[in-house]
């Protein structure tokens, strides 16, 4: 086992604090409407330019191992805030730095670290309740656009796009961010249920100009099995032909003789058919087939529950107003399923989302909810260069997370004002002893840090602005973009409550642990080992020259 380097007490804390400050100082230059960019060197390709706090934090590793431990702990704050709310990483870092700096001063002055931590925790618990009380619901398009704009660093087009996307696909709808092809940002909305499986044979195409299959008011056959024998399907095909409607087959696979017969029937115009593979794999495929059945009012024909394809009737088939199938995707528009059944299915999947343990499962389940509930919107980010595209895409992603958080838990006044108001309301809070009271004061003083940093990045004097804001009440604050005071809600400067809450909770959690640190242990740096291999091994090569 390698030898360890151990530091105690103040020596350890000073090193740790230096690491905290290096990382936090790099991150906090990005805060606010006048925050600057940070350029990150990459081992290959062009450098990345970003204003995203967590991207900056992730890049930082320090040479001194004790300092690096401090930096890594603050990095954890940014990552946790990002995971919980998808935004507010810079605010969380600034709060953590403020709590650690103030807290360690108190420890150096002889306060008990454990009581300080208890005081900080008490203040944060009370602050979270106050934040919830200040929060107002965020339901209208205008508020959503404002939240998106602020999170995308005052880029109004991004805020408007996100609000428009949420209008189209609902608050629960899936909104994804992709690289665009032009200079402008675009919004594409896919209404109805779309899944990524295309037609099984190009001979099904009936719209050669678009290379797609479009079927009006088709029946939809859902089978959880491979179909290779056409005889199984004859009763259904005959019934559909009599009804004079087209048929879409969604099955595990359609192959061989069955596929050939369907193609021939379609080309001769006997019955219009199109076949696609069912989306997903394994259990997820079964679940998605059931989703489609609920949406279209059909039944999944599965041998597991004793149903056979030969005995299927028109009652077992789903229906939709229109189905569009191209090379890679199938879209079902206006399924005839009962609204109550669809809502029941959505509620069932939401329950699974609550119980899901992995992010991947949760994401897939949310996609299923969106497909049943409304549709999918794609924001295509436009930019002139690859570097700008990456930076802008990261901002749009942040803004999207922020708006989701706002819809979930509401909004509070932005620009660091909400935390200042909360701190003022908690001025009378006391702990069980004097050291806890100091801990409470440390937390309350730290709550001013985001406002001070926003002002500092705008080139103004933080103390003057902070005092002016504290003299006001309610949503009165400072708009750093226009350098004027007023009602933050009227200015459209809003922060999602969830983002502010998560930032404060994670910052206090990690900062509290750092304040109570008394000893740090790390590996000793390895000394340079004597390099015997190269010099020793090559000695015999000297004689080779004469042999040539």
Curated annotation (Swiss-Prot):
SUPFAM superfamilies per the UniProt record, alphabetical: GroEL apical domain-like, GroEL equatorial domain-like, GroEL-intermediate domain like
Binding site for ATP: 30-33, 51, 87-91, 415, 479-481, 495
EC number of this enzyme: 5.6.1.7
Main location as per UniProt: cytoplasm
A Gene Ontology cellular-component term: cytoplasm
InterPro entries: Chaperonin_Cpn60_CS, Cpn60/GroEL, Cpn60/GroEL/TCP-1, GroEL-like_apical_dom_sf, GROEL-like_equatorial_sf, TCP-1-like_intermed_sf
Keywords: ATP-binding, Chaperone, Cytoplasm, Isomerase, Nucleotide-binding
Highest taxon of source: Bacteria
Reaction(s) the record says it catalyses: ATP + H2O + a folded polypeptide = ADP + phosphate + an unfolded polypeptide
Entry's localization field: Cytoplasm
Subunit field text: Forms a cylinder of 14 subunits composed of two heptameric rings stacked back-to-back. Interacts with the co-chaperonin GroES.
Summary of the function given for this chain in its UniProt record: Together with its co-chaperonin GroES, plays an essential role in assisting protein folding. The GroEL-GroES system forms a nano-cage that allows encapsulation of the non-native substrate proteins and provides a physical environment optimized to promote and accelerate protein folding.
The protein, known as: Chaperonin GroEL
Species this chain originates from: Klebsiella pneumoniae subsp. pneumoniae (strain ATCC 700721 / MGH 78578)
Gene that produces this protein: groEL
